[in-house]
A protein has these predicted regions:
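N-terminal pro-sequences and low-complexity stem/linker regions of secreted or lumenal proteins
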Residues: 1-202
């Protein structure tokens, strides 16, 4: 584990390890309510730009995702999932385990940034966080850790490994400065519309 400055130094030198996990300072750089989304977006942009501008861009894959949905509404019910093992969740007496570990949570944003990412591609496959493990296991020929990652999809449909779509890094729009008043205000002036009862099925 190294401070984030070490990531930026290694990205600039092309000396990042084969796999690394980048986490923001959740107390300051989270995009989750009630924090300033612009600060989190600025951090993500710095990470993406460090990889694009680095000498190892041609062999880079960044998976940008989130640990959970942040409490925001999702009209799609979580689907069933393969439990990772046969061990039930430990819950206090009298509390329900609901579906145990046999159901996914709500959807989270997920993007692949790489010269090998398919241009304009939106995957319609079900992925979960163990899909990242599955991709790592596939790349380095490693055994699965649980039943869930053994049965996960490795996200290869998002990549074109025959030819890079972004051999020359794309020009990205710069995020609004966190001091820009328009970056600090919400564009919604009132509550959103709630779907009528029975209109959302799953």
């Amino acid at each position: 584990m190294v401070p984030i400055a070490g990531f930026f130094t290694d990205a600039a030198a092309g000396t990042l390890p084969g796999y690394c996990l980048v986490e923001p300072d959740y107390g300051a750089q989270s995009e989750e309510n009630p924090q300033n989304i612009a600060v989190g977006e600025e951090f993500a942009a710095k990470v993406v730009n460090a990889l694009i501008d680095g000498p190892a861009w041609d062999r880079t894959l960044l998976i940008l995702t989130y640990d959970e949905h942040g409490g925001y509404y999702d009209h799609v019910p979580p689907p069933r999932a393969i439990p990772p093992d046969s061990i039930p969740p430990a819950v206090p007496a009298g509390e329900s385990a609901y579906d145990g570990f046999g159901r996914y949570g709500f959807r989270v944003p997920f993007a692949v940034v790489s010269p090998w990412a398919r241009r304009h591609h939106v995957s319609h496959r079900v992925y979960d966080h163990t899909s990242i493990l599955k991709l790592v296991e596939t790349k380095w020929n490693l055994p699965a850790l649980t039943f869930r990652d053994a049965n996960a999809t490795a996200m290869l449909d998002m990549l074109d490994l025959r030819r890079p779509s972004f051999a020359s890094p794309p020009e990205l729009a710069q995020p609004l400065a966190v001091t820009d008043p328009s970056a600090l205000s919400c564009s919604v002036t009132g509550p959103g519309t709630i779907p009528p009862p029975g209109s959302v099925t799953g």
